[in-house]
Amino acid sequence: MFSNKENINILTALLVEHGVTRVVVCPGSRNAAIAHNLSRVRQITCYAVTDERSAGFYALGMAQHRYEPVAVCVTSGTALLNLAPAVAEARYQQIPLVVISADRSPAWINQQDGQTLEQPNALGQWVSKAVSLPEPLDAEQRWHCNRLVNEALTACKRYGGRPVHINVPVSEPLFCFDVDRLPQERSIRVIEAVEDTVACKAFEEKLWAARRPLVVVGQLHADEAYQVRLSVEEICKDVPVLYECTSLSPDYTTGDAASGKATGPLNINEVLSRIERATTDVSPDYILYIGGTLISKRLKQYLRQIHRAETWTVNRGGHIYDTFMTLSGVVDGRPAYVLQHICKTLREKKEQQSLTFDSGYQQCWSAAIDAGKASTKDVATGYSQLSAVKAFFEQLPTDRPYYLHAGNSMSIRLANLFARSYVWCNRGVNGIDGSLSTAAGFSLVAGYDVFCIIGDLSFFYDQNALWPTLNRNLKVLLLNNHSGGIFNTLEGLEDSETCRQLMKAQHQLSAECACRQYGLTYLSAHNANELKAGLMAFLDRSNQQPVVFEVFTDSDADTTAWQNYHRQT
C-alpha cells in the first residue's frame, strides 16, 4: 500500500516513468511517507545514509557511474541545507542529481513550528530547476503537480545532467498508507536534436587556418572520455594534445580499464618546461579547449600568457568559460562529437595534402609530450606519499578492470602523475568534502573494485562515509602525513608561521579505530618494507570486507619528494 498523499504518489510514479532507479534516503519523520513509497516500488532501490552531507555525495557517486539520474531524499529543515556541497559539485560536474525534500505546509513556515525554514529555492543557483509541489485538492492542482515534477525531471537530464530540487510539502497526519496503487501519470519527454555539422563551421575555419593549433582536454564524464580518447589518439599525430587523468578513459565494457592502453600518464610540468626552453617560438596561435576544469595550475598560467592565441571552447550548454582569457567562441555541443567531426575533416585534408600546420611546431610539441610521458616512469624518491602512490600504480593488476577515485589537493595531483586510466574526482568545485562518500556511493553500484586515493584531512572530514553498509569492492588508500600537506607547496606560505599552524591543521589521528568500529579491514605502513607488504594485502582479491590501507609519512619528506620529482623532470 502507498501513502494517501497525492503529491507524493504523483512524484513516485513520475520518478519511475523518468527512469530513476536509485534513491539515497536519510532518516526523518516528515519524509517518511516519501521513503515508504519509494521502498514499495520494485523499480527503485533505496540506500539508507544517515549523514545528509555524506548522503548527497553518495548519490553523486552513484550518478557518476552511469550518468543516470539518482535521487537523494531528506526531511525538512537544515537537512536540506546539508546537501548544498554535493549539489554545487553536481552542478559544475554536470551530474543528474535529484534532491527531494519533505516540507511542512506553507501555512506553518516562519511560525516558530519545529524543523522549518524557507525551503523553496533554498539551493539557489546551484540547481537548474527548483519546484515546490502543491498538495492537490482538485484536477487542476493535480495537473499542476504533474507538470512541476515533469519540469524538474526533464531539466535534470538536459545538457549532460544537472541537479534539480523537488520540495514536497506534507501536511499532518503524515502516516496513512491506504492507497493500493500509484496513479497513471503523464510523462513529458524532451528529445535532444541531432548535432548539426553546420554549427561546427565557424570554429573549424579558424582551426584549419591556424599554423600552430593546440588541443587541451579538461575533465569529462567517463563515458564521453572514452570516445574523446579514440579521437585524441588520431588527432595527436598532427596536432599536439594536452590531457590529464580526468580527461581520457579506456573502455570499461571490454575490461580495458587496467590494460594500460589508455593515452597517458602525461607530466604536463615536464612538457611545459621543454616548451619554454625551446629556441624558437612554439606557442600556439589557436587553442581548442574541450571539457571541464584542469588540475594543472601551471598549464592554465602558461596558456593565459599567450595573448595572441584564439581560443574556442566546447561544452554542453554553451557556457562562456574564458579560462585562458583569450576566448573567441563557444561551441554548444558534445565534445566527443566535435572531435569526431574534426577527425573526419582532418583525414580529408591529409588525403588532399591541404594541411597548413607548422611541422616544426608539431615536432617540438610531440618531442616534449613524449618526454612528459617518459618522465613519469623513472622517479627516484625516498619513502613518501609520492613513492607510495607510484608503487600502488605499479602493482595495480593489469588482468582485471577497476575504477579509480581520488580526493582533491595532493591526492589527485599524485594520481595525475601515474594513473594509467581514467580517474573520477570532484573537480567541479575542488573541495575536500565528500570525496570518500562519492567513492563509497560509486562502489555500491559498480561491478568492479573501486580504489580511492585520499588524504588524511579529506578522509577524517568525511569518515561518516564508512557508516552505511558497504560492499567488499571499496578499497581506500589513505595518505596520512598528519596535516594538509599541499600547503607546504604554496610559495610564500612558509613565511607565515601563524598561517602554517592554522591552515595545515596538524593532528595525530589514525583511521584504525574508525575502521574497527565500522567493520572494515585495516592495514597500515610506516616505511618502505611495510608499504610493499601492505600493498600486496591491499590488492588481494580474497578480501571479504572493504579495506583501508593507511600509509603514514612525514610531511616534510613528502614536500621534499614532490619538489625533487619536479626538479628531476
What do the PLM-derived regions correspond to, one by one?
Residues 82, 217-312, 420-446, 460-464, ...:
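Glycine-rich, anion-gripping cofactor-binding loops and their flanking helix/strand elements
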Residues 148-151, 155-209:
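Conformationally flexible catalytic loops at phosphate/diphosphate-handling active centers
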Residues 21-24, 45-47, 65-104, 282-291, ...:
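A short, small-residue-rich loop immediately preceding and capping a beta-strand
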Residues 101-152, 243-366, 469-471, 490-491:
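Glycine-rich, acidic loop regions that bind phosphate or pyrophosphate groups
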Residues 1-2, 302-410, 512-514, 526-569:
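Phosphate/pyrophosphate-binding active-site segments
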